[in-house]
Amino acid sequence: AWGFILSAGQALGQAEGYKSLPLNAEFVSPPDSGEPKDRRAESARRQRYSERLRLVNDIYKGSASFEDNQAAFDQWYNEVVFAQMSQDSDAMLEAMATNREAMFKQLGNASNAQAVNHLVANLAFNKFQEIVTDNYPPASRLNAVVILGRLDQTIAKPRNVAPAPLAKALPVLLQYVQDGALPEYVRVGALWGIERHCRIDGQKQNTQIAAQQRSQVIAALLPLLGPKPDDRTQPVDYWMNRMATRSLGA
């Protein structure tokens, strides 16, 4: 489904010369220039990468202090993880889904709530909004809006803790759906996130989505159940209609 939607979005005629977040060359090799690489430098780079990843995992486990290492933690995500997801090289595009799922796996295994909350509510929430709304590669923008829809303020734990989606992400996703200037693949990705918010909320005994916000969801999604606009492709219209229907029925 995402392939159809992304292809339709790229056909909208976005300009070339996409933005990308700067990669930290201390941890990640710069884009391939075609010149032979220095093996010793590459080995040192891989060593630094492994050491920083180990530190981040130790922070999540609580065996390293988040307060003492926040600068290193922030640098890892802003200059490595998020930056990798903003590149348009073939290698980075192929690794994008793997990198995304690795990030969510880290969150699922983490026990340090302070570090998790900082990543979700501050770093990821802010940086992926930037990627969604600016001239980043289409795959990066779609990936970013999907991540925004998956951010949780309470991380699910098997058999005993249900997920609670990040509440402040829902108004942002609604704004994307209603913004006709955004590529339609972004709007479909936002609808997927809205459906997730509504579905999880519908499974709870006590709803977390306020009545006023539910009214905003209805107002944003009902128009999508109407006839297909002339400038919208059939696959995109199908997924918009489907996600809107599932959200309203949750």
Can you annotate each of these PLM segments?
Residues A1-S7:
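Bacterial N-terminal signal peptides
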Residues G249-A250:
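Long alpha-helical repeat scaffolds
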Residues Q14-M243:
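Extended repeat-based scaffolds of very large eukaryotic assembly and lipid-transport proteins
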